[in-house]
Amino acid sequence: MDLFDLIGPVMIGPSSSHTAGAARIGLTARLLLGEEVARAEIGLHGSFAKTYRGHGTDRALVGGLMGMQVDDPRLRDSLTLAREKGMKLIFSAVNLRGAHPNTVRMTVTGVTGRMLTIEAASVGGGNIEVHRLDGLNVVFTGKENTLIIHHTDAPGMIAAVTGLLAKEALNIANMQVYRRQAGADAMMVLELDGVPAPETLEAIRALTDIRSATFLKRRTC
């Protein structure tokens, strides 16, 4: 734990857990979707559900979905800005048994119709943990360079991806693989010491059985 975990980041207030962390969850969802958000169904669990209006969690989540950083002054007006853009927003309270009290489950739809479901928690100091993506259990924080690959579970898939990273001399600091069952949906989460070139990401996306590959650059604040 470092100082920023205790005092939180530079942000639009009032709370690092309820605003900064929420904005980061929204921004992570936007980056993973890979396009502008047209519709968001936002299910709030625990303390998020109880205090989201008073603490600005709703504005922070939506601001993140619109691509805003935690210190963007437009976060305060994000609900108005979203509606002006025609974004459809649906908020509800949900009970996610056993989840962290500051957890949100969102299903977002992009302007092309692409959909993504994400479940993530704001765990303090503006930090987040993503726990589920499109129904698959995952764990990542976004504090490191992170490559998230949605693919079909198939022999040789891990070797193909890591081989392309090795060609660029990219070191893998941490790697986890999650799957629904053998031969079904799977997710690779790789934390990297460096940043892959666009050509490397395109080569990964071109592999057979790859559904999507998204790179999240390490947070700097």
Predicted regions and their residues:
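A conserved regulatory-domain signal marking ACT and ACT-like small-molecule sensing domains
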Residues: 118-221
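Contiguous domain-boundary segments centered on the initiation and propagation of an alpha-helix
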Residues: 66-116
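Conserved phosphate/anionic-ligand binding catalytic regions in large, soluble enzymes, centered on
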Residues: 9-26
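Short glycine/threonine-rich loop-to-helix capping motif typified by GTGT followed
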Residues: 51-59, 101, 187-191
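Non-transmembrane, aqueous-exposed alpha-helical and coiled segments at domain scale
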Residues: 32-41, 101, 108
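General beta-strand structural signal in soluble alpha/beta enzymes
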Residues: 44, 90-91, 174, 215
